[in-house]
Amino acid sequence: MDTRYTHSPKDISHYSTEELRKEFLVEKVFVPNEVSLTYTHNDRMIFGGVTPTTESLEIILNKELGVDYFLERRELGVINIGGPGFIEIDGRKEAMKKQDGYYVGKETRQVIFSSEDAADPAKFYISSAPAHHKYPNVKISIDEIKPMETGEALTLNERKIYQYIHPNICESCQLQMGYTILEPGSSWNTMPCHTHERRMEAYVYFDMEEDTKIFHMMGDPAETKHLVMGNEQAVISPSWSIHSGVGTSNYSFIWAMCGENITYTDMDMVPMDELK
């Protein structure tokens, strides 16, 4: 597991492109037959990819977290963006097709991931945050979620937001997680942009062609920076940073947040004339 530390806005004001990428970008989220995770000290979120091929995979971080088992003091969100697979939670095995999600509560002792076909492996994107209470495990299908339709074709930001781990769907301590799909012809996400001082966030971009790129905007609104990102790459967004992007084509991304509350609308909008 890779560890990333926290920064203030002043810390990054003179960072080079290489330094920004090293601190905030995760270049390889899904590694075949591996659990590939990042631990950020921003609200102590863990995120990354689990890509089982010929063997089942389990997240084991006892030593790294100082616990007896991974979810002893944590909750977990899972969304499959690959081929059909399975998730086994404390002995109960369930199928997970593409776009299926799962909320797994605190004190769940074992979570095992597997694929139906090694040639078309499942790609489980996971996010985990510290938890103080045990809430029920819930399987989440995208078909059961009424999307928020927002943006316009005229402003190139027409998109559907599917809220998986959200009070309307399931209970959680502090983790929120969802899936945003941009319509063909749209390229902007989260613009006009915002920050949320009370929560950090992480994105993973995907459903992109090989030559499609995302210009992910970050940093203090008065001193913005950007990262050029490719398919299935992730980025950390501290609470003080904007997090927006524009692609050379449409794309999808999974967002995950944790922090002081689970109020999705708790955000501080940034007027366009304040961006620099």
From Swiss-Prot:
This protein's UniProt keywords: Isomerase, Metal-binding, Zinc
EC code: 5.3.1.17
Protein name in UniProt: 4-deoxy-L-threo-5-hexosulose-uronate ketol-isomerase 2
Physiological role: Catalyzes the isomerization of 5-dehydro-4-deoxy-D-glucuronate to 3-deoxy-D-glycero-2,5-hexodiulosonate.
Protein residues bound to Zn(2+): 194, 196, 201, 243
Necessary cofactors: Zn(2+)
Family: Belongs to the KduI family.
Isomerase listed as a keyword: yes
A molecular function GO annotation: 4-deoxy-L-threo-5-hexosulose-uronate ketol-isomerase activity
Coiled coil regions in record: none
Reaction catalysed by this enzyme: 5-dehydro-4-deoxy-D-glucuronate = 3-deoxy-D-glycero-2,5-hexodiulosonate
Gene: kduI2
EC class name: isomerase
GO biological process: D-galacturonate catabolic process; D-glucuronate catabolic process; pectin catabolic process
Co-factor remark: Binds 1 zinc ion per subunit.
A Pfam family that the UniProt record links to this protein: KduI
Pathway membership: Glycan metabolism; pectin degradation; 2-dehydro-3-deoxy-D-gluconate from pectin: step 4/5
